[in-house]
Amino acid sequence: MGAITLDGKATRDEIFVDLKQRVSELNASGRTPGLATILVGEDPGSQAYVRGKHSDCAKVGITSIRRDLPADISTATLNETIDELNANPDCTGYIVQLPLPKHLDENAALERIDPGKDADGLHPTNLGRLVLNTPAPLPCTPRGIVHLLRRYDVPIAGAHVVVIGRGVTVGRPLGLLLTRRSENATVTLCHTGTRDLPTLTRQADIIVAAVGVPHMLTADMVRPGAAVVDVGVSRVDGKLTGDVHPDVWEVAGHVSPNPGGVGPLTRAFLLTNVVELAEQR
C-alpha cells in the first residue's frame, strides 16, 4: 500500500475559489488588488514562473502588472523600477523574481521593496516580524507547506519535524512558522553540517526536504507512516526532479509529489498575501 498523495493542485483550486469571492468583495468596495512582477533577463524557468503567476491572477480577478527588464540593466534602473512600484497605487504587492543576474545584488533589491507591498514575505522587516510573531505577509512556500499538512489532517502540534535545508525562502522561515503556538511542532533544522542525517530523519513524524539534490531522501531514511514534503527542485535530463526518491512512497504515510505538491500552493499564497494586503487597506 502506497502513501496518500498530498495534492497541491486540488488544494490550490480550493484556495482560488475563496480568493475569487474575496476579490469580488474588494472590487465592490473600490479596492481592486494588483500583483506586479519584476523579471530581469530571459531565464526560461523564471519566465515560466512569472507567466504562471499572471495566469493565476486572471483566474481569481487580481490585476496583474509586469515589468520585464533586459539582463544587462544597471542597478540604478532596477532601483527605479522598484521605486515606481512602491509608489504605484494600482500595485498592492509585488515580487522581484529570483535569481537576478550576477551583477545585481539580490539582498539590496529585496530590501528596497516597500515592506507593505512585499508579496513574497521575504523582506527583512517581514522576516523579523515572523521572528517576533507579529502580523506581516508570510513567506509563501512555508505557508503552503503548513496549509497542505493541515488540509490532509497530518498532525502538527507536538510533532517532530525535520527540515532539510536552511535557505531563506523555505528552511529558516518554516522552522519559525512551525514553532509558533498555533502549530506547536518541535523542529530540527538540518543542513550540510548535520552529522548522521538518516538517524534524525528516522525519528521524524514529518520530513520536509528542501535542498535541491535529486532523490537525496531515500526509503531507508524514513520512518514508516511519516509524512514527507518534497520542496527541492532540480533538473535531471531536462525534467524537474524533487529531493524525494520514488521508493519513499512505499514507506511513508503521506507524500507530496514534485511537481504538483507544494509548488501550486506557493503561487496560491502569493495571491493570498496580495488579497490580505488589499483587505487591510
Curated annotation (Swiss-Prot):
Q: What reaction does this enzyme carry out catalytically?
A: (6R)-5,10-methylene-5,6,7,8-tetrahydrofolate + NADP(+) = (6R)-5,10-methenyltetrahydrofolate + NADPH; (6R)-5,10-methenyltetrahydrofolate + H2O = (6R)-10-formyltetrahydrofolate + H(+)
What role does this protein play? Catalyzes the oxidation of 5,10-methylenetetrahydrofolate to 5,10-methenyltetrahydrofolate and then the hydrolysis of 5,10-methenyltetrahydrofolate to 10-formyltetrahydrofolate.
In this chain, NADP(+) is annotated as bound at G165, R166, G167, T192, V233
Keyword vocabulary terms for this entry: Amino-acid biosynthesis, Histidine biosynthesis, Hydrolase, Methionine biosynthesis, Multifunctional enzyme, NADP, One-carbon metabolism, Oxidoreductase, Purine biosynthesis
| GO biological process assignments | L-histidine biosynthetic process; methionine biosynthetic process; purine nucleotide biosynthetic process; tetrahydrofolate interconversion
Q: How does it assemble?
A: Homodimer.
Q: Which gene encodes it?
A: folD
The record ties this protein, via Pfam families, to: THF_DHG_CYH, THF_DHG_CYH_C
Origin species: Mycobacterium marinum (strain ATCC BAA-535 / M)
Protein's pathway: One-carbon metabolism; tetrahydrofolate interconversion
Give the Gene Ontology MF terms in alphabetical order. methenyltetrahydrofolate cyclohydrolase activity; methylenetetrahydrofolate dehydrogenase (NADP+) activity
- EC number in record: 1.5.1.5, 3.5.4.9
For this protein, the record's InterPro entries field holds: Aminoacid_DH-like_N_sf, NAD(P)-bd_dom_sf, THF_DH/CycHdrlase, THF_DH/CycHdrlase_cat_dom, THF_DH/CycHdrlase_NAD-bd_dom
Protein name, UniProt field = Bifunctional protein FolD
Positions of disulphide bridges: none
Family, according to the entry, reads as follows:
Belongs to the tetrahydrofolate dehydrogenase/cyclohydrolase family.
Q: Give a Gene Ontology cellular component term annotated to this protein.
A: cytosol
